[in-house]
């Protein structure tokens, strides 16, 4: 059995080596869930100082308040607010899922300027959030080295709309810094190493590539927004806000408020599509829960072209969860590897 034993050990080493090599960051985010469109986030930074106005223009964000809300900045923040070199700004993007991958909608485009090359556009202009190969692929560019001034290309930023363990999350594209580890990134964003590794198809720090985007799931506040609402799914991460229902409602997400979306009628911004904001309609049914004897609020549940929906808040609020989000995602990939290794070793010992 010595020959068989050495053969099996060789297979074991080869298998482990192959699995390690095959696990690497691709820059693509998996998006295979039932939700085909959603709001996602990217973390943008520039090596040079810039302004919020420039970032808004670059990413084709319709309203500056969308960027302000994603970064929890005051609504009166100027468009010309300076953004320091390497300062990260969270930018909301419209995500679309197709063929198991999520990319930003075609509203983000870039026009080639003098001396531009695709690699420069990807790494410098868009801060490493996308690769030049991906730009070339989706725009069907025959030769990435032959582009002309004035050509306009779609910039396919990575994103996802998938749930995590059945829970809603906000997928955030984080550009990995040189020398970073999964543990550091997990601690920064309130998740765990296993979740980050499995979500991005890697095994550990050795496959973590600097200056490449990593899919980071940010815990989202729970809400009562209906599936047929025009703003569904309304997903916000901690310390962020958004104006919705034609600017008539302001919703905020705060971990200190039990990770529950808080929405109030707002007059801070002029309504769009409606001359005046309709009042929140009255909730039907009793607003006092018999089991926990706590009053139930009438909360925001979405909107249609004609009205704002409301519903009674959940019967009894859950106890406040931890500030960070540590997923219970099972490490099935690692388990399979260990199982195969154990099987080969057992055969070797026979």
UniProtKB/Swiss-Prot annotation:
One of its GO terms (molecular function) is chitin binding. Chitin binds at residues 114-120, 142-149. This is LysM domain-containing GPI-anchored protein 2. Residues 108-155, 172-216 form the LysM domain. It comes from Arabidopsis thaliana (Mouse-ear cress). Forms homooligomers. Interacts with CERK1. Binds to chitin oligosaccharide elicitor. A lipid is attached at residue 318 (GPI-anchor amidated aspartate). Glycans are attached at residues 30, 48, 76, 99, 193, 238, 258, 289, 305.
